[in-house]
């Protein structure tokens, strides 16, 4: 696994799951950090400040990295997050841009809630369309 992929995964596991934001940033984030997530300010300080409240609201965090894909200096990480014993479940897709040293310098994400299958499909029905013979 490349250094930039390791650094992207490190932010998830060490910063978000384990709560070791400063340590993860020191080893994985570049000098500048541009954040495109709603409510999260740019910079290492903004990232760290956001997670102070996040950790209070979600003291139990389990992160499962499903897959990591690279394209040049971009790293895409597909993640399942289980918060507070499954009280909140999120599926996220994150895009990280790395600098020439493999350190993370920019981040985008898409987040959706995840519910058990019975909740998703309990009132949903699907019928195959009719096709001409």
Where in this protein do the model-derived segments appear?
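C-terminal and inter-domain tail/linker signature
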Residues: 1-133
